[in-house]
């Protein structure tokens, strides 16, 4: 475990390792992003990225096939795209179509190309495609009228020949909103936008985070966490089937849950909340979810 102390002057909101686990990006209310080189249990600050005019909520690394690229989102309503070349970081693009805080940013599975999913308090989600000539082509969707707190891509599906399906029609994502709802969206070629496929009801307060498990199985798994102090696991046995709701545990958590994150293999779920703990959960053979440990500093 690497402990990075005194990295920022204010609260840290996100910390994400790159594809190879060698670089760590952190972001904070101090309006900065910091890039660290991580080696074993040691770390070294490489650069501090400035450009946002408000707290920076989240960061996400693009797949390395697109280069060393990072996206960040902020209370200032902007998404900034950063790139490292020859050891130097620079800002290469600004996505500024939202009129309120941008709360979530995530690159799509690389099979879909350089696509970015953005969620905002203005109630909208934007999907931004970065073209080779440097232009962008955003699709903007009215998702949750009183604000979108989080959005997460579904993994690229596997075809019968074992290859990943990178077609537009297979693109899906989930959103969580301040209307207490979880919504599933799918690309529609005729409409040339993402259309609502399912609305999932189960929370009694704001949905703070949603996470689609990266496992490419017949069954799809989603996790949603809420201000209501619950985590719901949603499962779908096949693409045409209904979504089934399972409370992760019957009793409520001690405090609001802020974040949910799946392991790369998709079999362990990490939750963090207002009690400053990170708890790990696994599904047992009976389909029940049980604690798999806590992460301690």
From Swiss-Prot:
GO terms for biological process: COPII-coated vesicle budding; ERAD pathway; mRNA transport; nuclear pore localization; nucleocytoplasmic transport; positive regulation of DNA-templated transcription; positive regulation of ER to Golgi vesicle-mediated transport; positive regulation of protein exit from endoplasmic reticulum. GO terms for cellular component: cell periphery; COPII vesicle coat; endoplasmic reticulum; endoplasmic reticulum membrane; nuclear envelope; nuclear pore; nuclear pore outer ring; Seh1-associated complex. Pfam families: WD40. It is found in: Cytoplasmic vesicle, COPII-coated vesicle membrane; Endoplasmic reticulum membrane; Nucleus, Nuclear pore complex; Vacuole membrane. InterPro entries: Sec13/Seh1_fam, WD40/YVTN_repeat-like_dom_sf, WD40_repeat_dom_sf, WD40_rpt. One of its GO terms (molecular function) is structural molecule activity. The keyword Membrane applies. The keyword Cytoplasm does not apply. It is a peripheral membrane protein. WD repeats lie at residues 7-46, 51-92, 97-138, 143-195, 202-244, 252-291. Keywords: Cytoplasmic vesicle, Endoplasmic reticulum, ER-Golgi transport, Membrane, mRNA transport, Nuclear pore complex, Nucleus, Protein transport, Repeat, Translocation, Transport, Vacuole, WD repeat. Gene3D superfamilies: YVTN repeat-like/Quinoprotein amine dehydrogenase (2.130.10.10). PANTHER family: NUCLEAR PORE COMPLEX PROTEIN SEC13 / SEH1 FAMILY MEMBER, PROTEIN SEC13 HOMOLOG. Functions as a component of the nuclear pore complex (NPC) and the COPII coat. It is one of 5 proteins constituting the COPII coat, which is involved in anterograde (ER to Golgi) double-membrane transport vesicle formation. First the small GTPase SAR1, activated by and binding to the integral ER membrane protein SEC12, exchanges GDP for GTP and recruits the heterodimer SEC23/24, which in turn recruits the heterotetramer SEC13-SEC31. The polymerization of COPII coat complexes then causes physically the deformation (budding) of the membrane, leading to the creation of a transport vesicle. Belongs to the WD repeat SEC13 family. The basic repeat unit of a COPII coated vesicle is composed of 5 proteins: the small GTPase SAR1, the heterodimeric SEC23-SEC24 complex, and the heterotetrameric SEC13-SEC31 complex. This repeat unit polymerizes to induce membrane deformation into a transport vesicle. Component of the nuclear pore complex (NPC). NPC constitutes the exclusive means of nucleocytoplasmic transport. Present with 21400 molecules/cell in log phase SD medium. This is Protein transport protein SEC13. The gene is SEC13.
């Amino acid at each position: 475990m690497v402990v990075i102390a005194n990295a920022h002057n204010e609260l840290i909101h996100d910390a994400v390792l790159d594809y190879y686990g060698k670089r760590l990006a952190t972001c904070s209310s101090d309006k900065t992003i910091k890039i660290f080189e991580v080696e074993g249990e040691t770390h070294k600050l490489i650069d501090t990225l400035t450009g946002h005019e408000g707290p920076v909520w989240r960061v996400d690394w693009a797949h390395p096939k697109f280069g060393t690229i990072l996206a960040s989102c902020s209370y200032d309503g902007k998404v900034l795209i950063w790139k490292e070349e020859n050891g130097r970081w620079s800002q290469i693009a600004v996505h500024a179509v939202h009129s309120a805080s941008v709360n979530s940013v995530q690159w799509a599975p690389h099979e879909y190309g350089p696509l970015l999913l953005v969620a905002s308090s203005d109630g909208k989600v934007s999907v931004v495609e970065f073209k080779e000539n440097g232009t962008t082509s955003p699709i903007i969707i009215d998702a949750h009228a009183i604000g979108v707190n989080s959005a997460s891509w579904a993994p690229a599906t596997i075809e019968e020949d074992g290859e990943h399906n990178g077609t537009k029609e297979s693109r899906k994502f989930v959103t969580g909103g301040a209307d207490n709802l979880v919504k599933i969206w799918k690309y529609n070629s005729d409409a040339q936008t993402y259309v609502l496929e399912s609305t999932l009801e189960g929370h009694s307060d704001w949905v703070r985070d949603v996470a689609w498990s990266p496992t490419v199985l017949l069954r799809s798994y989603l996790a949603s966490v809420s201000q209501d102090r619950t985590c719901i696991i949603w499962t779908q046995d096949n693409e045409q089937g209904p979504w089934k709701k399972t409370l992760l545990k019957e009793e409520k958590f001690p405090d609001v849950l802020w974040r949910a994150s799946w392991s790369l293999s998709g079999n362990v779920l990490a939750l963090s909340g207002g009690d400053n703990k990170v708890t790990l959960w696994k599904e047992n053979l009976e389909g029940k979810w049980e604690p798999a440990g806590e992460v301690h500093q």
